[in-house]
Regions:
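Conserved beta-strand positions that form and line the central face of beta-propeller blades
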Residues: 40, 51, 59, 86-90, ...
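Short active-site loop at a secondary-structure junction
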Residues: 16-28, 47-109, 148-160, 243, ...
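Catalytic loop of the DD-peptidase/beta-lactamase superfamily, centered on the K-T-G motif
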Residues: 1-39, 179-182, 187, 229-496, ...
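Short linear capping/connector segments at secondary-structure termini
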Residues: 43, 55-56, 86-93, 120-125, ...
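Short, surface-exposed loop or secondary-structure junction motifs
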Residues: 45, 98-319
Length: 569
């Protein structure tokens, strides 16, 4: 495509971000090794209406992982570390998992270690815009004395491994991760505006202020009761004071220099093997590739090799994607939390759209599957019972909300995924791609008892329920103080208007101070559905049928229910 036509199309793709009094993005595009597009849209600071440009500094969040991994790679190149090195040889406190964890397992995310962010935010109730210190991170890491799977058995995205890699850099070099990365990566490449922030009070020149929708920050009643404001946006920032998994602050201009280094390495020995190391996926125990390199996803995009990684945290979103064989790249930095839904490769994201332009791909819609689906939908009327309503899987606490639109049912789960289901007869529905089967079980009175889901080889059972306010006398047994000694965190459970209010005893850590409505048995569901989803809490009883504990249930399968809050009074 001609350069002028390409730039015109790129402007069309990005124009929705060109708004006054609204956050925006910085976009850089490289084609065949040449920078063809570099532009800012929207505002870096809404207080002073400062516009975004290529020198605006953004938090690029999880894009930090590739820089942390590069630090480790440099130390391996020096002979100061090895891939098969046992991490407990550096940090003895990690031996409590009972299994050898290697640097290889951390780099390629084949470790199964629980995510410290899940523990901090979704168990301890720390707010997204609060600071988390190094000591707090270590407390959460050592409190998780289990793994999801054996080392190297599976791949699972997580932040803990890269936090530990950052700590390994500091332990080996006797300097901070921030200083080591600056001396050995940023300065050699001329990335003069890039740094790893380990001090939330740091003054950042030309910083883009981070923003979120008002309800994203002020989602619980303990905030809203003090304000009648109707703002659409709020300032937001993830004030974590430790690097490794995140906290990379950078500019579009600097990331373009980083992108160039993939083709002509200027770090340390200048070896091309170093770049190959960064961009080659790791292997599982069975010899299969895991799809993840050193802080970079590695895959295929319409027949082209692609390396890429996104970033998301309070107030910011980012994405970097490179087609190395075509020497073409896309870099996007934004100062709004929800921009993460626009970037990346889901639902035709911005990065995907730009990459398609670069490779000359024309997206032609294939109506074949849709036509086939329409034929199946004609049978929808044969199912007489009304499926609409809420359902819960008591094992995982995952929720469904089933709705009906134009004689077609849609299943929306706790994570916001919506699945169109089609009727195949004999009380059986299937997803449009036929990968999921939903079997409706009814009693002799034709009342739905449950829906059985088969997703691949896995089965789960969802039971219908109605949220209900129940008499205060029945709720009284749940009241009291509950404590998790592992985390040094306590919650109070009180009754209010037929609901339970669970509140952190540390009033500053109020992210999970929510009202809960009764759902089924001893499970309660939060009234508010935000970025934390519909939150579930299940209480446990002893042999005398007395309430003895509660846990936060976990439909994301990170096992946060392993943290038990025991009733102490």
């Amino acid at each position: 495509m001609e350069k002028i036509k390409m730039i015109t199309k790129l402007n069309e793709v990005c124009k929705k971000y060109d708004r006054k009094d609204y956050p925006g993005i910085a976009v850089g595009i490289v084609e065949n090794g040449e920078l063809i597009f570099s532009k800012g849209y929207g505002e870096a600071n809404l207080d002073y209406n400062i516009l975004i440009d290529e020198n605006t500094v953004f938090h690029a969040c999880s894009m930090a992982k590739q820089f942390t991994a590069a630090c480790i790679a440099l130390l391996i190149e020096e002979g100061k570390l090895s891939l098969d090195q046992d991490v407990s040889s550096i940090f003895s406190q990690l031996k409590n998992s009972g299994e050898k964890v290697t640097i290889y397992n951390l780099l390629y995310m084949t470790n199964g270690i629980p995510d410290v962010y899940d523990t901090a935010y979704f168990v301890c109730g720390i707010r997204e815009d609060e600071g988390i210190t190094r000591d707090e991170f270590w407390r959460y890491v050592t409190a998780c004395d289990w793994n999801f799977f054996k080392m190297g058995e599976k791949w699972s995205y997580g932040n803990t491994g890269y936090f530990l890699l950052g700590q390994i850099v500091e332990a080996v070099t006797k300097t901070s991760l921030s200083q080591y990365a600056d001396e050995h990566i940023f300065k050699p490449l001329g990335m003069n505006s890039t740094f790893i922030r380990d001090d939330r009070t740091k003054i950042i020149k030309k910083r883009a202020v981070g923003y979120s929708n008002y309800d994203h920050v002020h989602y619980n009643d303990s905030y809203k009761r003090y304000t009648s404001r109707n703002d659409k946006l709020s300032i937001n920032d993830e004030n974590v004071e430790v690097g490794g998994a995140g906290q990379i602050w950078t500019t579009l201009k600097d990331l373009l220099l980083w992108d160039k280094n993939f083709y002509n390495n200027k770090l340390r020995r200048g070896s091309s093997e170093f770049i190959k190391f960064l961009t080659t996926p790791g292997l599982l125990n069975n010899g299969k590739e895991c799809g993840y390199g050193l802080g970079l996803f590695v895959g295929e995009f319409y027949g082209n090799k692609i390396v890429h990684h996104g970033g998301w945290a309070g107030g910011y979103s980012a994405y970097y994607a490179q087609l190395p064989e075509k020497k073409s790249s896309v870099i996007i930095l934004g100062n709004h939390t929800d921009f993460m839904y626009d970037f990346g490769f889901k639902n035709g994201g911005l990065t995907e759209g730009i990459l398609k332009l670069l490779i000359g791909y024309e997206n032609e819609r294939d109506n074949t599957e849709e036509k086939q689906s329409d034929n199946i939908n004609l049978n929808q009327i044969e199912f007489d019972l009304n499926l609409s309503g809420e359902y819960i899987d008591q094992e995982s606490s995952c929720l469904w909300n089933i709705t009906k639109k134009k004689d077609i049912y849609y299943v929306e789960d706790s994570l916001g995924n919506s699945t169109k289901i089609l009727y195949y007869g004999d009380s059986v529905f299937k997803s449009a791609d036929k990968e999921k089967t939903y079997t409706v079980v009814q009693n002799n009175k034709q009342i739905i008892e449950c829906v059985k889901l088969q997703d691949g080889g896995a089965w789960s059972v969802y039971y219908p329920f109605c949220r209900e306010k129940i008499d205060a006398s029945k709720l009284k047994i749940y009241e009291g103080s509950y404590r998790c000694e592992k985390l040094n965190v306590s919650y109070n459970v009180k009754i209010h208007d037929g609901k339970l209010f669970i509140r952190n005893e540390n009033l500053h850590n109020n992210a999970l101070d929510l009202y809960y409505t009764h759902a089924i048995k001893d499970t309660f569901i939060s009234d508010h559905n935000s970025h934390i989803g519909n939150y579930c809490t299940t209480f446990s009883r002893d042999l005398n049928n007395e309430i003895v504990s509660f846990s936060y249930r976990d439909y994301t399968k990170t096992l946060r229910e392993n943290f038990i809050f025991m009733k102490i009074q």
